[in-house]
Amino acid sequence: MNLSTKQKQHLKGLAHPLKPVVLLGSNGLTEGVLAEIEQALEHHELIKVKIATEDRETKTLIVEAIVRETGACNVQVIGKTLVLYRPTKERKISLPR
């Protein structure tokens, strides 16, 4: 799913007050963490994930893996925080055209 710039801006505004729902620890990306992200996306549609790593390359690889495995859209990455969006069947968030 590709998001337009206008849609990404809308989602960034909605995500601003949110707290990270999933925190990645020193173990990195595990099956349990992926399951937690899946469950959070199913429940909320728009979530923040906190990635605890200092290395940019590692963080980029983790972000790409999360997006690939969950099928979610990468809305934004700021510092160690990733914002993900994946619509559910009943669409809780309406996107602008």
Swiss-Prot record:
An MF annotation (GO) of this entry: preribosome binding
Boundaries of every CRM domain copy: 1-97
Subcellular location(s) of the protein: Cytoplasm
Record keyword RNA-binding present: yes
Keyword presence, RNA-binding: yes
Annotated signal sequence range: none
GO BP terms: ribosomal large subunit assembly; ribosomal small subunit assembly; rRNA 5'-end processing
Pfam families per the UniProt record, alphabetical: CRS1_YhbY
Name of the protein this chain belongs to: RNA-binding protein YhbY
Organism field: Escherichia coli (strain K12)
Lineage, top ranks: Bacteria, Pseudomonadati, Pseudomonadota, Gammaproteobacteria, Enterobacterales
